[in-house]
């Protein structure tokens, strides 16, 4: 079955609303995760730390430049994801509609490209890297 990523996006306002009712949000999210586990569709789920604690590595010239925090012009921030194994985009959308999100949040639904859809040299590079990592030689 295809895999779909449900990408949780929020704004400063929606994140503030979420933090105002964090205990309730955690409880309802746990119930939602249990539903997905019972249905056998959940592969992974993670929430991200505050974007102010992250860094951005920007490739704009000869050497990468590292800056604190998210992009300056970003209005929506990637807050976390659910990775699902479902039959179709429509099924992924139905799960996305059930996410206990606060007003102002958005859920982006994206299919994960299969290995057979990658350019030939990319797929080989992934296999080579996996083999190198298993031996400790990169």
Model regions and ranges:
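Conserved, structured core segments of small domains
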Residues: 1-138
